[in-house]
A protein has these predicted regions:
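Phenylalanine-focused residue identity feature
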Residues: 8, 17, 39, 71, ...
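Short glycine-rich, low-complexity/disordered patches
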Residues: 32-41, 63-66, 97-104, 138-144
Length: 186
């Protein structure tokens, strides 16, 4: 086992990534308390930061045999998903163009922002809870598993929801006034 000060789980990129992951979890667990505009502003700030921090963590190897513990219950997952869905209402759905299934389909595929963000939440919450064990090997393997999942699915889900969230954030009155200004100017 490495010296605690130099172990992979305590290096700056790992700590920064886990810190953003925890911030996302805390925010999503209280998302019902925010107004829609505040929700969009916050989620559009934290998701790109989470993506960046995940990309900056160097690769590591597993230290233990077996799987890391999963902490998120179905009820917790559903509570987060439903809170996000309530914030977005009918704007929760979007047409997905970057799914593997699209290559074999003539029909557009509908996806849900709330479901994709809840999937990301589950990965981040499991990571955060494994980090709380303060067992370096468990922390290491949870981080390795989370980063593998980033490459396999949640990184793409994060990028996929940014497009519709961005459009929603611009679909307010301010955007309409800006469009009017530019169309009358030219």
């Amino acid at each position: 086992m490495e010296n605690s000060n130099t172990h992979f789980v305590y290096q700056q990129p790992a700590i920064e990534f886990v810190t953003v992951a925890v911030q996302l979890c805390i925010y999503l667990e209280k998302v019902a308390e925010y107004e829609r505009e505040d929700f969009l502003d916050k989620i559009l700030s934290i998701l790109p930061l989470l993506y960046l921090k995940a990309r900056l963590v160097p690769k590591s190897e597993l230290e233990l045999d077996g799987y890391t513990e999963q902490f998120v219950t179905e009820q917790e997952y559903e509570a987060v998903r439903q809170s996000i869905a309530a914030q977005l209402g009918s704007d929760d759905t979007y047409l997905e163009v970057y799914m593997e299934d699209m290559r074999y389909s003539d029909e557009p595929i509908t996806a849900f922002i709330s479901e994709n963000i809840a999937d990301i939440y589950q990965e981040m919450k499991d990571l955060a809870c494994n980090y709380q064990t303060q067992n370096e090997s468990v922390m290491n393997d949870a981080l390795v598993a989370c980063l593998e999942a980033f490459e396999q699915h949640w990184g793409q889900k994060l990028l996929n929801v940014l497009r519709p969230l961005h459009a929603l954030s611009l679909s307010n009155d301010e955007w309409s006034e800006t469009q009017y200004f530019f169309s009358s100017y030219c």
